[in-house]
Amino acid sequence: MPVKWLLHWQPNQGSTFSSQILNEVTQSIESLNGVKEGTWKATLNYYKPMLQDQANQAEFPREFVGISLPEEPDKYYFVIRSQRIVVEADSSIQMIMESLQSYKCKLSFYFEGLEYQLGDFRLRVGKVVPTHAETIRGVVMEVEYLPISSMGMAKKLMEEFLEIWQEAMSKRSLPGKFVNKELNFEKFGLGDNYTPQHTAVGYAFFMANLMAAIQAGRG
C-alpha cells in the first residue's frame, strides 16, 4: 500500500481545537487544486483488562488500542505499545472480545473528515471526537504518496510536499501547525514496505499522546 504519514495539529500555547481549523485546512488543500473525493472515518478504542483475580494482573497487558481503518473495513488492528506488538485480525474479533469480557473498552474516539486527491498524493483531514460527545479533541491529517510503498524511497518526496504544504498553511496565520512524529517501526517488527500495521501503530502513539494531554488538562 502507499506510504502514509500521520500528522497531528499542534495548537499554540493557550489555543484550542475548533472546526474553524478544519475549514482553513480544507480551503488550503483546495487552493492547491486538491480534488475532493469524499468522506472518511476511522475508529479507535482504548481497552483495559477486566481482572477477576488481581494476582493475574502481570499476565495481561495493562492497556492496548484497537483500530478500524477505512482502507481495510474487514480488518481490525490491535496495538500493545508496552510490548511493541501489532496484530491484524478479522473485524468480527470485536464481537468475540465482548463475549469473552476479558477486556473492556474504556474510551472510544472516531476520526472523520474529508478526503482529497492532490496530484500523486491523497490527503485525509479529520477531527478527533470522543464517541457520544461533540468536543473536538484533535485534528489529524493523513498524507499518502500513492506511487510508492517504500518508506525510505518516499521520505524525501514526502518532506518536500510537507514544505509546500506548511508554506500554504502559514499564509492563513492559524494558531498552531501540523506536526509529523517519526516513529521507529522496526521495534514493532515492521519493515520498510508500508502496511496497514504501520498506520495502526501511528494511531496508537497518537492516542497515547492525546490521552496524556487530556489527563494533563484535567490535572
UniProtKB/Swiss-Prot annotation:
Subcellular compartments: Nucleus
Purpose of the protein: Component of the Mediator complex, a coactivator involved in the regulated transcription of nearly all RNA polymerase II-dependent genes. Mediator functions as a bridge to convey information from gene-specific regulatory proteins to the basal RNA polymerase II transcription machinery. The Mediator complex, having a compact conformation in its free form, is recruited to promoters by direct interactions with regulatory proteins and serves for the assembly of a functional preinitiation complex with RNA polymerase II and the general transcription factors.
Family as reported in the entry's similarity comment: Belongs to the Mediator complex subunit 20 family.
Protein name, UniProt field: Mediator of RNA polymerase II transcription subunit 20b
GO MF assignments: transcription coregulator activity
Annotated organism of origin: Arabidopsis thaliana (Mouse-ear cress)
Chief place where the protein resides: nucleus
One example of a Gene Ontology biological process annotation: regulation of transcription by RNA polymerase II
UniProt cross-references to InterPro entries, sorted A to Z: Mediator_Med20 (IPR013921)
Gene expressing this chain: MED20B
